[in-house]
Amino acid sequence: MKKLLIFALFTLFTALMSCKKETVETDECDADPTACGCPQEPPSCNDPGNNGGPTISGKVYVSPSGSDSNDGSEAKPFKTIQKAADVADPVKGLEIILRGGTHLSEEVKFRTSNINLHSYPGEWAVIKAIMTVEDISSCLWFREPESENITIENVEITGGYYYGIKFESNWDDDRSVPFEKRRGVRNIKILNCKIHDTGRDCIKITPGCQNIQVLNCEIYRSGMGPANVSAQNAEGIDNVNGSNMTVRNCYFHDIATNALYAKGGAKDCIFEQNLIMNCGEGGLVAGYLDTDAEWFNTTTNPTYFESINIIIRNNIVVNTKWEGIGLYAALNAQVYNNTLINVAQEASAGLMIARGEIYGTPSGDKYPKCKDLKISNNIFVQTASAKGKMARLRGVPEGTNDVSNNFYFKPGTLTFRIDKNDDDYSEFDGFANWKTQSKLDANSTNADPKLDAQYHLAAGSPCIGNGKALGTLIEKDYDGGVRGAKLDIGADQASNGTALPVPPTAVANGTKGTGGSN
């Protein structure tokens, strides 16, 4: 009987091992990521969603009234986006064309490159996931780190327990993957989309993702699900160490926490010509206070800078409870010609310059300071009732810093704070005291910038013609108009063409972001 039991266990173990999917060595996957067992293997390798069937390239159509038994042609469309994703050719890719109406998502999973997902011309497709089931963590999930060349255009994305869209990476928290082999989804374009009413973040970008463009989108009502009830962590765009991200001509509004940030060592990001209104925390943020240590690349960033070489320019920010612009452990940040209105309503500061706080690194806790900042031609306006400071240094920045030609205005007295360290700080009133104690803003002004109802410069504004020359860094304004040789201060260049409406004019089908042109 004992021998029979041993034989049965051996037989069961052999059967289980024979069913185990064969994996391929990492070097072989590097050479051919589409080999079976590699991240970009085709569904035919062993995908129950495709049942080993053929893949499709070219165009495929999906309609709420279609059938997954169809062939995906325009005349016989699939019913679900997941079916189209499952049959996508892993090398040639697939153009997925969505007919108008609502497409239900049970977390659409993409795992191949060269995906172009968009609405049928003249129609508007809505992709909707529920926010109450944790297993449906994202409405759209690009799950394979090796994937690249992803375009999402002219669609509306809503829901997801955590995220509207998530781009994945192989960056692990136990540091088992060498830095040189860490990567995420690359070459991403999100164009003319609405992304809203998500459980937490509208767009989630994980460490190692690269070359991300978010253009002409409307992003709103993050953090609407049960996942955010206790967390209060729901950005419009949450980018952790995703480099080369450009966010342009987007309209963010009614965001639970920060409109967008790039932190964790993200490099070479650009935030420009965006409109941000009504944020529960900050508006435009480079870095953050306490990113987890495992998300930094300490080979290229041993100092744990949160943000490297970011450019923030020509944005309008209205109504933030915390900072209008926040720089945390930022290296070489450039902040030019932004207009920030009614910022720091409840806490923080209109302009926050702060150290980072990275805990639990292999060599102990780290507190990197900002370094080599350039902040010019910005307008900061607070209401008389604002509880936050006008500006704050939480750790004096290092290196060579040029903070100049800015306008600060608040009815009544301006308030400031400088923290040299945890036990040595001062809170004080008066712009002259700020200049003396911070050694910044020598050429800046405390005066009413005279803005109109659209947050553009009114006739007679003292900001007209008084900006610092910045060459090719600032060639256009918020509206896309040419600046010319003599810069104004703020996001608007006066009298250079038609101003965009603020907020943007709603359109029946789709979105145009701010209405600006890329």
Give short role names for the model-derived ranges:
Residues 137-141, 163-164, 201-202, 225, ...:
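Structural detector of coil-to-beta-strand junctions
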